Amino acid sequence: MVLLDPLANALSTIKNAEAIGKSSCVVRPASKNIGNVLKVMQDLGYIGDFEFIDDGKAGIYSVTLVGRINKCGAIKPRYSVGTASFERWEKQFLPAKNFGALIVTTSSGVMSQYEARDKKIGGQLLAYVY
């Protein structure tokens, strides 16, 4: 079976494990993009530690959950955003102002929309979490 969107699959796995009350989950396959998104989620406090485990194939991430995620998901298509248009996308994907975060890929790497707004750089939307 072909996996069309590994990021969406990873976020769905995390959301489902969070919903049934698990303390950890396994995300496969691993990629740099998924690792960068997990790092941003960890910095924002939505997940605990995560580690890469080499299984001889693509690898897996073992993620420790802390029970703070209500919903998370990938944003498709990957919309391009500028610094002035973050608020429009926050209204579309997040339930309230200053609640949750958009995860953005920029020329300076993957970061939250708060960090991108502070650095005054735009990019493409990858995911949302709240």
Curated annotation (Swiss-Prot):
Task: Tell me the keywords, alphabetical order.
Answer: Ribonucleoprotein, Ribosomal protein, RNA-binding, rRNA-binding
GO BP, one annotated term: translation
Q: What is the lineage of its organism?
A: Archaea, Methanobacteriati, Methanobacteriota, Stenosarchaea group, Methanomicrobia
Q: Does the keyword Chaperone apply?
A: no
User: What family does this chain come from, according to its entry?
Assistant: Belongs to the universal ribosomal protein uS8 family.
Keyword rRNA-binding attributed: yes
- Regions crossing the membrane: none
Q: Which Gene3D superfamilies match?
A: 3.30.1370.30, 3.30.1490.10
What role is this protein assigned?
One of the primary rRNA binding proteins, it binds directly to 16S rRNA central domain where it helps coordinate assembly of the platform of the 30S subunit.
Q: How does it assemble?
A: Part of the 30S ribosomal subunit.
Please give the GO cellular component terms listed in this UniProt entry.
Answer: cytosolic small ribosomal subunit
Q: Which domain of life is it from?
A: Archaea
Enumerate the GO terms in the molecular function aspect. rRNA binding; structural constituent of ribosome
Name assigned to this protein:
Small ribosomal subunit protein uS8
